[in-house]
A protein has these predicted regions:
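C-terminal output helix
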Residues: 101-116, 121-126
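Charged docking surfaces used in two-component/phosphorelay signaling
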Residues: 12-20
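Active-site beta3 strand of CheY-like receiver
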Residues: 42-49, 53
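Short amphipathic alpha-helix used as the core "switch/output" element in two-component signaling
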Residues: 60-69, 88-92
Protein backbone atom coordinates (compact mmCIF):
# COMPACT_ATOMS: atom_id res chain seq x y z
CA UNK A 1 0.00 0.00 0.00
CA UNK A 2 1.13 3.52 -0.76
CA UNK A 3 0.23 6.45 1.51
CA UNK A 4 -0.07 9.87 -0.15
CA UNK A 5 -0.30 12.44 2.64
CA UNK A 6 1.43 15.79 3.05
CA UNK A 7 1.00 15.93 6.84
CA UNK A 8 4.04 13.97 8.06
CA UNK A 9 2.72 13.04 11.50
CA UNK A 10 -0.60 11.84 10.10
CA UNK A 11 1.20 9.79 7.44
CA UNK A 12 3.40 8.13 10.07
CA UNK A 13 0.39 7.41 12.30
CA UNK A 14 -1.47 5.90 9.35
CA UNK A 15 1.56 3.80 8.43
CA UNK A 16 1.79 2.44 12.00
CA UNK A 17 -1.95 1.69 12.03
CA UNK A 18 -1.79 -0.15 8.71
CA UNK A 19 1.26 -2.13 9.78
CA UNK A 20 -0.53 -3.14 12.99
CA UNK A 21 -3.25 -4.58 10.72
CA UNK A 22 -0.62 -6.63 8.90
CA UNK A 23 -0.62 -4.40 5.81
CA UNK A 24 2.72 -3.70 4.17
CA UNK A 25 3.28 -0.03 3.34
CA UNK A 26 5.61 0.36 0.36
CA UNK A 27 6.10 4.08 0.87
CA UNK A 28 4.84 7.48 1.94
CA UNK A 29 4.56 10.21 -0.67
CA UNK A 30 4.15 13.78 0.61
CA UNK A 31 3.25 15.14 -2.83
CA UNK A 32 1.90 14.19 -6.24
CA UNK A 33 5.30 13.84 -7.92
CA UNK A 34 6.48 11.37 -5.30
CA UNK A 35 3.14 9.52 -5.50
CA UNK A 36 3.57 8.98 -9.24
CA UNK A 37 7.23 7.93 -8.87
CA UNK A 38 6.49 5.48 -6.05
CA UNK A 39 3.52 4.01 -7.90
CA UNK A 40 5.67 3.41 -10.98
CA UNK A 41 8.46 1.86 -8.89
CA UNK A 42 6.55 -0.10 -6.23
CA UNK A 43 3.26 -0.90 -8.05
CA UNK A 44 1.14 -0.79 -4.88
CA UNK A 45 -2.08 -2.78 -4.67
CA UNK A 46 -3.86 0.12 -2.93
CA UNK A 47 -3.33 3.85 -2.37
CA UNK A 48 -4.49 5.91 0.62
CA UNK A 49 -4.80 9.40 -0.87
CA UNK A 50 -5.21 12.73 0.89
CA UNK A 51 -7.62 14.82 -1.16
CA UNK A 52 -5.90 18.18 -0.61
CA UNK A 53 -2.26 18.18 -1.70
CA UNK A 54 0.08 20.96 -2.76
CA UNK A 55 0.53 21.42 -6.49
CA UNK A 56 -1.40 22.06 -9.68
CA UNK A 57 -3.42 18.83 -9.30
CA UNK A 58 -5.18 17.59 -6.22
CA UNK A 59 -5.48 14.06 -4.86
CA UNK A 60 -8.69 13.38 -6.79
CA UNK A 61 -7.16 14.12 -10.19
CA UNK A 62 -3.99 12.13 -9.52
CA UNK A 63 -5.98 9.20 -8.10
CA UNK A 64 -8.02 9.05 -11.28
CA UNK A 65 -4.83 9.03 -13.35
CA UNK A 66 -3.20 6.33 -11.18
CA UNK A 67 -6.30 4.19 -11.57
CA UNK A 68 -6.39 4.63 -15.33
CA UNK A 69 -2.67 3.97 -15.77
CA UNK A 70 -2.04 1.30 -13.14
CA UNK A 71 -5.46 -0.04 -12.12
CA UNK A 72 -4.72 0.71 -8.49
CA UNK A 73 -7.74 1.37 -6.26
CA UNK A 74 -7.73 4.44 -4.05
CA UNK A 75 -9.14 5.20 -0.62
CA UNK A 76 -9.48 8.94 -0.08
CA UNK A 77 -8.84 10.50 3.30
CA UNK A 78 -9.95 14.03 4.05
CA UNK A 79 -10.93 16.37 6.82
CA UNK A 80 -13.76 17.51 4.52
CA UNK A 81 -15.72 14.26 4.14
CA UNK A 82 -18.97 16.13 4.82
CA UNK A 83 -18.44 18.49 1.85
CA UNK A 84 -21.13 17.45 -0.66
CA UNK A 85 -19.47 19.19 -3.60
CA UNK A 86 -16.19 17.39 -2.93
CA UNK A 87 -17.91 14.02 -2.55
CA UNK A 88 -19.87 14.52 -5.78
CA UNK A 89 -16.65 15.38 -7.61
CA UNK A 90 -14.84 12.31 -6.25
CA UNK A 91 -17.69 9.96 -7.13
CA UNK A 92 -18.13 11.50 -10.57
CA UNK A 93 -14.45 10.97 -11.44
CA UNK A 94 -13.96 7.69 -9.55
CA UNK A 95 -17.33 5.98 -8.97
CA UNK A 96 -17.46 3.93 -5.80
CA UNK A 97 -14.21 5.27 -4.36
CA UNK A 98 -14.34 5.19 -0.55
CA UNK A 99 -13.86 8.45 1.32
CA UNK A 100 -12.76 8.28 4.95
CA UNK A 101 -12.92 11.18 7.35
CA UNK A 102 -9.91 12.41 9.33
CA UNK A 103 -9.23 11.47 12.04
CA UNK A 104 -9.49 7.89 10.83
CA UNK A 105 -11.48 5.26 12.68
CA UNK A 106 -9.44 2.01 12.83
CA UNK A 107 -12.38 -0.36 12.40
CA UNK A 108 -13.81 1.61 9.47
CA UNK A 109 -10.35 1.73 7.87
CA UNK A 110 -9.97 -2.04 8.23
CA UNK A 111 -13.44 -2.73 6.78
CA UNK A 112 -12.83 -0.38 3.85
CA UNK A 113 -9.52 -2.02 2.95
CA UNK A 114 -11.02 -5.51 3.18
CA UNK A 115 -13.89 -4.43 0.93
CA UNK A 116 -11.54 -2.96 -1.69
CA UNK A 117 -9.39 -6.08 -1.79
CA UNK A 118 -12.48 -8.06 -2.82
CA UNK A 119 -13.62 -5.64 -5.55
CA UNK A 120 -12.64 -5.89 -9.20
CA UNK A 121 -10.97 -2.76 -10.63
CA UNK A 122 -13.51 -0.11 -11.67
CA UNK A 123 -14.64 -0.35 -15.28
CA UNK A 124 -12.49 1.60 -17.68
CA UNK A 125 -9.36 1.05 -15.62
CA UNK A 126 -6.50 -0.84 -17.20
CA UNK A 127 -5.34 -4.00 -15.52
CA UNK A 128 -2.08 -3.78 -13.62
CA UNK A 129 1.02 -4.87 -15.44
Amino acid sequence: MLIVEDEVMLALELEAELQSMGIMVCGIAPNIGDAVALTMKEKPNLVMMDVHLEGPQDGVEIARWLGEMYGVPVVFVTAYADNKILLERIHKLIPGAPVLSKPLDSSHLSETIADLKNRPPPSGFMSRR
